[in-house]
Amino acid sequence: MKLTCVLIITVLFLTASQLITADYSGDKRQYRAVRLRDEMRNFKGARDCGEQGQGCYTRPCCPGLHCAAGATGGGSCQP
């Protein structure tokens, strides 16, 4: 009987500790995912932007420029 009580208390304790730590680890994973997403957006190849007169079909124009549609369907970065 004593062994059964000890086992039940142990299982309850372990279950409670897992539930408590699961809440904290979920937040860390969420923040880690956000950090990784931001790193992927800011890697060197993603920061490349089109200068004036360059095409803007596959990459965005640099700040201060906008993509103007051309006659051939593609656009170029213009002020």
From Swiss-Prot:
In terms of superkingdom, the source organism counts as Eukaryota
Provide the positions where the record notes the PTM 4-hydroxyproline. P60, P63
Propeptide residues are 23-47
- Please give the InterPro entries that the UniProt record associates with this protein: Conotoxin
- State the signal peptide span: 1-22
* Functional description taken from the UniProt entry: Ion channel inhibitor that inhibits the increase in intracellular calcium upon depolarization in DRG neurons. In vivo, both intraperitoneal and intracranial injections into mice induce hyperactivity.
Recorded family membership: Belongs to the conotoxin O1 superfamily.
In Swiss-Prot or TrEMBL terms, this protein is called Conotoxin Vi6.4
